Amino acid sequence: MKKKKIQNIIILAIAILIIGSIIAYNYSTDITKQKGLQFGNELSQIESNISDIQGKFYSEKTKWVEGDISKEELLKFYEIHINNFRETISKYNELTPPELFQSSVALLKISAETQLESDLQFIEWVKTGDESAKIRSDTLFQE
């Protein structure tokens, strides 16, 4: 009888261990999914912000080309644009991407930095009329 009781205790302990392992595995999987979802949402928000910032940049450029705003108004807007763009790019550093996506995030950040540099060169051209700045801006934009 003692042998059967010990055997039942061992079986119960193994069953509890198996159930505990399954629960821990499922919990770990859920946490990983939640972190991945959060990362995806944060990355999507950054990309959306960059798209909005660039849309406004080109909208103001068009207004200036069409004569709807002055050069001074354009440059004032571009000063704000540059600050917003830099702030948004810095948010890439706050991301905690899964290892699989680290290189992709790095490439997205480099792309945004290149776009910012293109914008800075364009602004330099607007300020000074230096055609080489315009050419650099166009070259960076094509990258």
Residue ranges with predicted function:
Residues 25-45:
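Ser/Thr/Pro/Gly-rich low-complexity linker/stalk segments immediately outside membranes or between
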Residues 12, 26, 30, 79-84:
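Short, well-ordered helical secondary-structure segments
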Residues 1-18, 22-26:
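N-terminal Sec-pathway targeting helices
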Residues 38-143:
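Alpha-helical segments in soluble extracytoplasmic regions
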Residues 1-5, 30, 70, 130:
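Serine/threonine-rich low-complexity intrinsically disordered regions
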Residues 2, 32-35, 97-100:
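Juxtamembrane loop-transmembrane helix junctions in multi-pass integral membrane proteins
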